């Protein structure tokens, strides 16, 4: 089970979050739910493009990046643990960007696999390595993966990072008005702008048909009286048409309900993940009826078990929280006053006491994650 580690990053002072199965993260406004997703997104982008570009593109620069309670000499840390592997980077800000001479370490138990210090010195399994300037701006983990593909330990961590996907702020309006660009079919965009292109690709490729079927069957389950299939029109852009039960004339997606389009997006986000991956979705409850929210969680759990996925939802929804009444250990709370966050709900409140209520009811009544406690 992987664990996300964050220190002194925006609203997060110290975070240590074991990730697995389907979980929800909740908290009062401003406690750092979206920041957790940004941490995952920065890690993923840094592996692809290097840390300076990841911070610039994902966060708009490093201004105000350090937690306000952290001292000036305290580093910002992002990291992941996987079994006995531990990887982390320490960010050193300089102006509006992040210095590429960042400290980075990968260890296995008590053994150091590689370390790069703040001066740029790089040591891999006890031997000093001279990196060309282009490689020096990359993560050390990326360098080891490319130049030592036989290193199984580095490969395990790299595969974990490669399979992180973060989704937020879906562009429903853009999809209605413009559809998806036909050429963008490599992976699902963070805001889902190419979701129709990806769905058409999945439908037409035998190896990806299961992904399309997951979305299609999920929509049928969530909207039994509204949805009876989907088709696509393609040119330079891909648009969609939705069939209703008993009607052979499809509706253009521009006329479809927000809830249907939102659910389609959410199911596609889950389906896009590869086996063993991590999918993080910000506040999926928007535009969804409670019945659809329940079907979403049901489908997410089944897909997670089948494909060994970690699916993370951030939420303010009592309905979504209620789907975890029997699993309070999968509800994590960014609760003020705790040194290490998030706190598992069954550790924050007695499990026997929790059994007397619904989690959503307790959330509404401010028994945890209360805005008034900020």
Could you say what each language-model-derived stretch is?
Residues 21-60, 257, 262-269, 299, ...:
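Phosphate-binding glycine-rich loops of NTP-binding sites
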């Amino acid at each position: 089970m992987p664990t996300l580690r964050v220190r002194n990053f925006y609203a997060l002072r110290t975070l240590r979050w074991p990730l697995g199965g389907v979980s929800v993260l909740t908290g009062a406004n401003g406690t750092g739910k979206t920041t957790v997703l940004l941490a995952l997104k920065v890690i993923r982008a840094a592996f692809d493009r290097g840390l300076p570009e990841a911070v610039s593109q994902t966060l708009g620069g490093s201004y105000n990046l350090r937690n306000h309670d952290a001292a000036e000499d305290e580093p910002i840390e992002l990291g992941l643990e996987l079994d006995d592997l531990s990887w982390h980077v320490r960010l050193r800000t300089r102006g509006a960007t992040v210095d590429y001479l960042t400290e980075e370490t990968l260890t296995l138990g008590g053994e150091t696999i590689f370390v790069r210090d703040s001066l740029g010195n790089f040591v891999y399994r006890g031997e000093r390595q001279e990196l060309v300037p282009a490689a020096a701006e990359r993560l050390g983990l990326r360098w080891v993966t490319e130049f030592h593909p036989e290193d199984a330990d580095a490969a395990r961590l790299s595969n974990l990072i490669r399979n992180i996907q973060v989704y937020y702020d879906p562009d429903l309006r853009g999809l209605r008005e413009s559809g998806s660009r036909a050429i963008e079919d490599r992976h699902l965009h963070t805001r889902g702008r190419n979701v129709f292109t990806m769905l058409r690709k999945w439908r037409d490729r035998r190896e990806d048909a299961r992904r399309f079927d997951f979305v299609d069957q999920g929509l049928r389950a969530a909207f039994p009286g509204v949805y009876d299939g989907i088709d696509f029109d393609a040119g330079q852009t891909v648009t969609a048409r939705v069939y209703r039960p008993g009607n052979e004339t499809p509706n253009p997606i521009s006329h479809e309900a927000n809830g249907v389009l939102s659910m389609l997006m959410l199911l596609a986000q889950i389906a896009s993940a590869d086996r063993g991956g991590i999918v993080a979705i910000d506040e999926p409850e928007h535009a969804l009826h409670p019945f659809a929210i329940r079907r979403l969680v049901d489908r997410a759990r089944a897909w997670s078990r089948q494909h060994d996925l970690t699916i993370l939802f951030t939420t303010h929804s009592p309905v979504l929280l209620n789907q975890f009444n029997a699993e309070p250990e999968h509800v994590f709370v960014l609760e003020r006053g705790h040194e290490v966050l998030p706190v598992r709900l069954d550790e924050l409140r007695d499990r026997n006491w929790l059994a007397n209520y619904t989690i959503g009811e307790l959330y509404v009544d401010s028994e945890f994650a209360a805005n008034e406690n900020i």
